[in-house]
Amino acid sequence: MRAFTPGASITEASRQKVLQAAEALNYSPNLLARSLATNVTHQVAVFVDDFANPHKLPVLEMLTERLQAEGLLTVLININRHFDHVHALINADQRQFDAVILFGTAFREETLGDRRLGPDFPPMFVLARDSQIPGVPAIACNAELALSQMVDYLFDKGYRRPGFMTGARTLSTALGRRHHYANFWRRKGVESVIELNADRYSADAGAEAARAYLSATPPPSRVDVLMCENDILALGAMDTARSEFGCRVPQDLAVVGFDNIELGATPTYGLTTYEQPTYEMINTIVEMITGARAVEAVTLPGHLVPRLSA
């Protein structure tokens, strides 16, 4: 097996002889058997619970491609009401993954204390959200910097009655965007930020939250700019504001998002948004998993993408 193991103690001449013989016999090493001996499976579990968000798929594509380039197989685990974080973590523990990536999921610290989890649980990483759990580092966009840039941009545009649409409560807390948005408006002298609540991250949820707010609020009292926690909420809110309430965007209501999904760039929306440093975040987390970089929390800067919606 040493001939098939990078860095193993074997001369190059001997390694080549073994590889040539293996090729002639159409032999390849049994990775399952090797994992029993080395306790390394070359498999990484990725937990996802927000499949309605179109930002997820391109990030997953980039993440899996980068992991595969390192010889790591990705196992996708769908977190939902029938298969929660505890079940997923137990499943990951039983399968002896080399690492677990929590992508777009938020869970409670006490989950890690579940007595059914083994003592040698694989290392966990949070991608694209904050983590306050000791030993579970987050690799994320710098939300404070992002919201500072966004509020500066909106303030310079003349907006003074801001609103913010949140998504699912547990995930919103992990994002921290609403908190920073309100803080930076206060620094501008704007004390109140109207909050709209969507119960999930989808265009329908964004439309429902916008409909409830616009129906209950007369035009003179409405916000003049609405930031949505992500782009798909913003697109749903824009559709409803324009088609059901006759709002002109941005003249009557400016709308901004976060993520820079492809649909938001189309002429139909022209959505002002913020792009996360996806490549850099993925590269960082893979380097930590492979041991090429120290394991630690990392925040990285993204960039503002101004368009016609604000």
Q: How would you label these PLM feature ranges?
A:
Residues 1-39:
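N-terminal helix-turn-helix DNA-binding module of bacterial transcription factors
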Residues 25, 93-96, 157-158, 213-222, ...:
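Glycine-rich phosphate-binding loop signature in dinucleotide/nucleotide-binding domains
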Residues 39-152, 156:
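Alpha-helical recognition/docking segments in bacterial nutrient-uptake
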Residues 45, 96-105, 163-165, 196, ...:
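Periplasmic-binding protein-like
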Residues 48-58, 76-85, 139-149, 165-186, ...:
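Hinge/beta->alpha junction and helix N-cap segments in small-molecule ligand-binding domains
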Residues 119-124, 190, 250-253:
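A short helix->loop->beta-strand "cap" motif at the edges of active sites that frequently abuts
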Residues 215-310:
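Flexible loop/turn connectors
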